[in-house]
């Protein structure tokens, strides 16, 4: 049973409701993903600029795109945070002040920082921008949280390795905003402090170049002089060093009652289908619990929905304590994705019942597809006829980003998505 926190709730018409609803924080690797995240229910979005972030392989944002994203988010009451969480070397100092000033001028709500140099510089040149301490600082005790509060930071992003008991003590002893991960990839290294990528590919993982070496397939040998004995691999399936992905959907009630301020989804390099699916599910969970915590139950369809965009097994990692063997991913990878994202709705004409769709994966006549979006309940439909933009009939939508049309007798909306089972 979840412990009740009276500081975050009130009684309305004889029923307890949560008044301190946590922020739902979503990832976005480009402007399209940012807009999708906000449209599907994110309260805030974290993005990376083209410098000083840890995901150089994401599309990332120009200053102009950041400003556009901020203006878009503002219309929906959402915030934008920018990652500037590299561990800076001397050559990274050139241009830092100008970059942080530009972020301030773009009216971003906050920056996510690991390096004290960047913290000090931001507070000096962009004083209106909140400073959030990155998970790269590996905070896992309340004294460290207290230290950074005294340094003037507005929020701390906890290490993924922090347990529920440790987080509870932090909230009780330190008055500062706490952000905690709820969904996404885990790292074999402590909060991302890893140099495997540096050694294996000459890409600095702490300056945006991580190639996810821990997810490669490995064989393990024990050597004794000239002899090598395979301990794992060869006839067995190769193993990966990386743990299972994080999924804390069933722990959301506990996290809300603990007073955690921001619940964070990982995945700036993930697809818009991933962003839309995961954000929409956690939006429903948070809203449902806050509206009626006493009668809250995790719905089966929420769990099934998350599985539609997952390609790895999941676990609760460190939140409920030290993970055991079952939390790790050894042996053959379990590919769990059950659906392909095949199209983004651009328009729906109610008079003609015609859908205009941008193709994102192959589909054909006769396919059973599923539609989902924040304005609709999920439903399935069988594709009967497909036309191109010029009205020519097609047997399939074969080309990436091709604009196609087809009939649908249920109303849908722009930015709704279409997917099909594998």
From Swiss-Prot:
The keyword tRNA processing applies. GO terms for biological process: proteolysis; tRNA modification. One of its GO terms (molecular function) is peptidase activity. Keywords: Hydrolase, Protease, tRNA processing. Disruption phenotype: Deletion mutant lacking both trhP1 and trhP2 shows reduced 5-methoxyuridine (mo5U) formation in tRNAs. It comes from the Bacteria. It is an enzyme of class 3 (hydrolase). Its EC number is 3.4.-.-. Belongs to the peptidase U32 family. Involved in prephenate-dependent formation of 5-hydroxyuridine (ho5U) modification at position 34 in tRNAs, the first step in 5-methoxyuridine (mo5U) biosynthesis. This is tRNA hydroxylation protein P1. It comes from Bacillus subtilis (strain 168).
């Amino acid at each position: 049973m979840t412990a009740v926190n009276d500081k975050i709730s009130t009684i309305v018409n004889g029923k307890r409701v949560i008044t301190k609803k946590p922020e739902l924080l979503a990832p976005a690797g480009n402007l399209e993903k940012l807009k999708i995240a906000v449209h599907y229910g994110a309260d805030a979005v974290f993005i990376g600029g083209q410098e000083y972030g840890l995901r150089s392989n994401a599309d990332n944002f120009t200053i102009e795109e950041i400003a556009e994203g901020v203006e878009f988010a503002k219309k929906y009451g959402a915030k934008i945070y920018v990652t500037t969480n590299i561990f800076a070397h001397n050559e990274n100092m050139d241009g830092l002040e100008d970059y942080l000033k530009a972020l301030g001028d773009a009216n971003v709500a906050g920056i996510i920082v690991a390096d004290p140099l960047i913290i000090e510089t931001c507070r000096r040149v962009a004083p209106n921008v909140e400073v959030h301490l990155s998970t790269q600082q590996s905070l896992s005790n309340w004294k460290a949280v207290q230290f950074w509060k005294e340094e003037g930071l507005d929020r701390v992003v906890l290490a993924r390795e922090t347990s529920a008991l440790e987080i509870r003590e932090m909230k009780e002893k330190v008055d500062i905003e706490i952000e905690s991960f709820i969904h996404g990839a885990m790292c074999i290294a402590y909060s991302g402090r890893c140099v495997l990528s540096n050694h294996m590919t000459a890409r600095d993982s702490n300056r945006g170049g991580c190639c996810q070496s821990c997810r490669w397939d490995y064989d393990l040998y024990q050597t004794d002089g000239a002899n090598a004995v395979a301990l794992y691999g060869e006839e067995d399936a190769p193993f990966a060093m990386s743990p299972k992905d994080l999924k804390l959907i069933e722990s959301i009630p506990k996290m809300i009652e603990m007073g955690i301020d921001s619940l964070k989804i990982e995945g700036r390099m993930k697809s818009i289908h991933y962003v839309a699916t995961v954000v929409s599910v956690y939006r429903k969970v948070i809203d449902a619990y806050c509206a009626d915590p006493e009668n809250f139950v995790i719905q089966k369809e929420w769990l099934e929905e998350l599985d539609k965009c997952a390609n790895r097994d999941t676990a609760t990692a460190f939140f409920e304590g030290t993970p055991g063997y079952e939390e790790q991913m050894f042996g053959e990878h379990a590919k769990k994705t059950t659906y392909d994202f095949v199209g983004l709705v651009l328009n729906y004409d109610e008079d003609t019942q015609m859908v205009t769709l941008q193709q994102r994966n192959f589909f054909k006549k006769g396919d059973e597809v599923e539609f989902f979006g924040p304005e609709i309940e999920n439903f399935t439909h069988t594709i009967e006829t497909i036309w191109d933009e010029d009205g020519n009939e097609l047997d399939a939508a074969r080309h990436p980003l091709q604009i196609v049309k087809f009939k649908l007798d249920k109303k849908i909306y722009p930015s709704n998505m279409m997917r099909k089972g594998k």
